[in-house]
């Protein structure tokens, strides 16, 4: 640009040429912060991503299902508005998935960048439940008020999910979960993405007082189907019939759940048949004679290839065959079994059925690995034996076992004692990041260093 300069009398004139150059690199996605956290439907969709910049750039997607289709060239050194074309593939998986696109200046050193986050649904419809509500379940604002209403609105294998807000729900009878419908709890009642939950919150399902059967059933799923139950507390069962406080068969995955304060004549901590448990806490349950039903089995009955990852089984009481875990043909990784009382004999923390192979890898257990009538696990790699005293140097080192706080103290031997290849989740039961140290911790809770 040319600027003309003169004296006050305008007798002298000269011209000044001003050349403007970019002093500071600039690059940003031209969307609000809320719109930079994008929700995409299960079927996939195309996205136009507007970007303002004054530098050459690179555009990189974090996941293979996010496709960068077109990146217009940057021309010149003035601010330029471009439109980057993005395509999201259909989600054929079991759960919501998350990824991102980073736009940054070209080169190895990043001076300026911006990110578009993408969450993609795994279903076509969500049914909402919130304690005290009275709607039709189509949104949080119009949520159903009871779990029974929410389940009635779902259909088996119907490309649906059931989202239940935090709070306490008193069940009316035994409850069958819908097959192929992921059921999530712990929402505050405003989220539109699964990742936005505060995992310290849970939805509590209280068994009906008159129900003498397991309070929750998950029946066998179709071959190849997996179904998640995540973010719940199951409590209040008083069982004299059936398998245990909760009962699940083939294909179900229980994650970030607590099973506590239940009484049953068998399997008060749950009965699981070809099921996966991840980041679960099972505590303060009692297997004992209940009315005319005589005590049998254990606290947790894991059969037919059930797998446990980072499960904490503590402070339960049994008059059955063992006080902690009864398992066959399964696998137990990064789990702790401690403080479980056997009322009728030796304090058996676990039991292996005859002639069944079971993997025990990087677990911590009190009083010996298993009572098994002469059988042995096919592997006990990395397992440690715990003292019966929580406060001992070789005790579990829970924060306050007496009051039910099973998070870890900084001196706990469970810290960094797990097996990293067995990690099944990037988060623990209350949303803390895994892995925090060099290795994953044993149990449902990851120890986090306080800054």
Question: What kind of feature is each model-predicted range?
Answer:
Residues 224, 382-448:
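C-terminal accessory segments
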Residues 131-165, 441:
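Acidic Gly/Asp/Thr-rich repetitive segments characteristic of extracellular carbohydrate-active
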Residues 12-22, 112-124:
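C-terminal edge beta-strand
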Residues 172-182, 191-200, 210, 229-231, ...:
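Predominantly extracellular beta-rich ligand-binding scaffolds that present long acidic/polar faces
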Residues 23-61:
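Solvent-exposed, low-complexity, repeat-rich "mucin-like" stalks and linkers
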Residues 50-85:
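Surface-exposed binding patches on compact interaction domains or structured appendages
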């Amino acid at each position: 640009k040319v600027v003309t300069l003169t004296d006050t009398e305008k007798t002298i004139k000269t011209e000044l040429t001003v050349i403007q150059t970019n002093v500071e690199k600039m690059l940003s996605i031209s969307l609000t912060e809320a719109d930079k956290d994008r929700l995409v439907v299960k079927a996939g969709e195309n996205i136009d991503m507007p970007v303002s910049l004054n530098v050459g750039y690179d555009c990189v997607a974090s996941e293979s299902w996010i496709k960068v289709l077109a990146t217009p060239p940057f021309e010149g050194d003035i601010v330029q508005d471009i439109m980057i074309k993005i395509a999201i593939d259909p989600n054929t998986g079991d759960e919501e998935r998350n990824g991102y696109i980073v736009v940054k200046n070209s080169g190895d050193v990043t001076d300026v960048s911006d990110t578009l986050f993408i969450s993609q649904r795994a279903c076509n419809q969500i049914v909402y439940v919130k304690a005290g509500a009275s709607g039709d379940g189509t949104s949080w604002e119009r949520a159903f008020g009871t779990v029974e209403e929410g389940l009635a609105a779902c259909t088996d294998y119907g490309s649906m999910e059931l989202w239940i807000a935090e709070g306490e729900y008193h069940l009316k009878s035994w409850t069958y979960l819908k097959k192929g419908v992921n059921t999530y709890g712990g929402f505050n009642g405003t989220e539109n993405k699964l990742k936005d939950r505060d995992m310290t919150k849970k939805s509590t399902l209280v068994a009906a007082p008159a129900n003498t059967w397991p309070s929750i059933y998950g029946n066998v799923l179709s071959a190849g189907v997996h179904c998640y139950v995540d973010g719940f507390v199951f409590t209040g069962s008083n069982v004299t019939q059936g398998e245990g406080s909760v009962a699940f068969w083939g294909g179900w995955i229980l994650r970030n759940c607590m099973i506590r304060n239940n009484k049953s004549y068998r399997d008060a901590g749950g009965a699981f048949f070809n099921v996966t448990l991840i980041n679960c806490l099972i505590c303060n349950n009692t297997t004992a004679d209940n009315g005319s039903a005589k005590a049998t089995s254990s606290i947790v009955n894991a059969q037919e290839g059930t797998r446990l990852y980072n499960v904490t089984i503590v402070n339960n009481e049994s008059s059955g065959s063992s006080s902690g875990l009864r398992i066959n043909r399964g696998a137990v990784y990064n789990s702790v079994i401690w403080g479980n009382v056997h009322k009728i004999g030796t304090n058996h923390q676990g039991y292996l059925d005859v002639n069944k192979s079971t993997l025990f890898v990087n677990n911590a257990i009190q009083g010996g690995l298993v009572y098994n009538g002469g059988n042995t696990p096919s592997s006990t790699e990395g397992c440690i034996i715990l003292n019966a005293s929580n406060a001992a140097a070789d005790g579990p080192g829970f924060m306050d076992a007496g009051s039910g706080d099973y998070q870890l103290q900084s001196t706990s031997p469970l810290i960094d004692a797990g097996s990293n290849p067995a990690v099944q989740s990037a988060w623990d039961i209350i949303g803390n990041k895994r892995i925090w140290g060099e290795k994953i911790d044993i149990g449902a809770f990851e120890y986090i260093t306080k800054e």
